[in-house]
């Protein structure tokens, strides 16, 4: 007798941030696809407005809508609520009380943006072609600087804690290797990745 897969997903975005459907549509699809558990994890508010993160004035609606849907579909699927929270710097990260005090089931910690040498916030969560342009424009083509900045932020995020899941840990891995084919064979990068995933494991994620 074949073993049936236990379908779950805890990283999803709806119309409260940059998702392409409303919360209930995602839940209905998860049920129709046979999921046993599903998590909603919109992008958390940042200290400034963006096109892809939730605003604080939407938080109450976000939590209330989830609560209503959790009750509505309680006999069909386990639903849990979270946020994907960015580490931006030592003043903006998942461990802040403003995020810890929210009634969430879980939190995802992620890095989507870096500071350029001039202090400009640069979104590096982009398609590979756009990533190349951003590295050239804001970092003078210094891919090594971008890589070290990204992973240093992740190490700081791990030390601060305040989350349950590390978000898309391969984000830089893909874009950087497209920018510089052969990167994955460079010893320093291989050692950096090994240290990163070892640190994740040591922190219990």
Question: What are these language model-derived features?
Answer:
Residues 16-17, 103, 108-205:
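Domain-core and long-helix interface of multi-subunit machines
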Residues 2-89, 94, 99-101, 105, ...:
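An N-terminally biased module of ancient metal coordination in phosphate/nucleic-acid-related enzymes
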């Amino acid at each position: 007798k074949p073993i049936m897969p236990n379908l779950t997903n805890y990283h999803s975005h709806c119309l409260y941030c940059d998702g392409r459907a409303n919360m209930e549509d995602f839940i209905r699809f998860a049920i129709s696809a046979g999921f046993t558990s599903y998590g909603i994890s919109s992008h958390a508010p940042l200290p400034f407005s963006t096109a892809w993160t939730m605003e604080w004035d939407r938080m109450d609606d976000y939590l209330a809508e989830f609560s209503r849907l959790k009750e509505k579909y309680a006999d069909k699927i386990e639903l849990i609520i979270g946020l994907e929270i960015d580490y931006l710097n030592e003043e903006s990260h998942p461990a802040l009380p403003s995020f810890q005090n929210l009634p969430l089931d879980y939190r995802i910690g992620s890095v989507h943006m870096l500071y350029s040498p001039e202090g400009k916030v640069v979104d590096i969560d982009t398609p590979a072609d756009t990533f190349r342009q951003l590295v050239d424009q804001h970092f003078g083509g210094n891919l090594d600087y971008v890589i070290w900045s990204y992973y240093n932020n992740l190490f700081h995020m791990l030390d601060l804690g305040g989350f349950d899941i590390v978000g898309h840990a391969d984000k830089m891995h893909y874009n950087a290797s497209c920018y510089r084919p052969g990167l994955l064979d460079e010893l320093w990068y291989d050692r950096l990745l090994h240290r990163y995933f070892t640190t994740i494991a040591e922190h219990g994620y």
